[in-house]
């Protein structure tokens, strides 16, 4: 990907990242809690706020600690009911809060599309507009019993004015090719959305806070980007819901396990961590000039690359389960983003416009129903 000539590496921005337990399996109550964090961050001068992986309506810890029959019968219907559709009435509450508080945010949520779900991050700007939406490319291990996969359109960044922001979920930070793709997009601020980590360790050290904090910090060093790690906390409500009186399950979901962090482009810690069982926000002021200093020595997708020897290929088209072949032989396969389709559907709900770029529904208007043909689109990468 070529660099953006308008991309600036000057200026400072105050940011915040969340460490907190959602109101598990209750989207409306979790959004209430999110709005509280949005208002708090804005009041303290932050221009950007990062939320954890599928914070709405919560991370499905049940998939790791019990059998499939128990998980499906006890949790899946309610989880689906409390998942969000892109731009629905519940998401519009977040949009309105962003606009009223003049703050941009990335929210991790369970996105439902028909009867399927996806591990998604929605990007909402200071005006309350949805500017991007991405899905986790490959859900991890038992997550694949709950969520579908993303595709090549899900590698993206968005310039919010104060900096170019991208994001990945959880163990996407273990994927070298995915990380390299993000580095190539000249990401300046990276949202690393995580759940709380849980006690399958020491048998599985990869799931420990230590291991996952290590790859998060490494992302900052490798990509020379600021990283905001946002994480859940396992509270008593989560533990009681998923473990009940089962001592073995409770041992797998110990209280706490929060580990929000903010790192500089050289890997330096920029904020004092909260206690693992505490809820709250971490703050830092980011100086974008520090990226230039870090990249002077190593820019893996720039001067420190060898594309004549090693290169990455990515297909950014939407590969949908059904493709319609027209009379002239063309198919419906394209790179149209899900956000673009959402805006087009907004227009159809207002009136007929030929220019689809200018119009949006007022945030206090009811959200339009999702268009049936929007089955698998995602926001495409900005070069």
Curated annotation (Swiss-Prot):
It catalyses: an aliphatic nitrile + 2 H2O = a carboxylate + NH4(+). Changing residue 170 to S/A: 100% loss of activity. The active site is at 53 (proton acceptor), 136 (proton donor), 170 (nucleophile). CDD domains: nitrilases_CHs (cd07564). Residues 13-288 form the CN hydrolase domain. Its EC number is 3.5.5.7. One of its GO terms (molecular function) is aliphatic nitrilase activity. Transmembrane segments: none annotated. Signal peptide: none annotated. Keywords: Hydrolase. This is Aliphatic nitrilase. It comes from Rhodococcus rhodochrous. The lineage of its organism: Bacteria, Bacillati, Actinomycetota, Actinomycetes, Mycobacteriales.
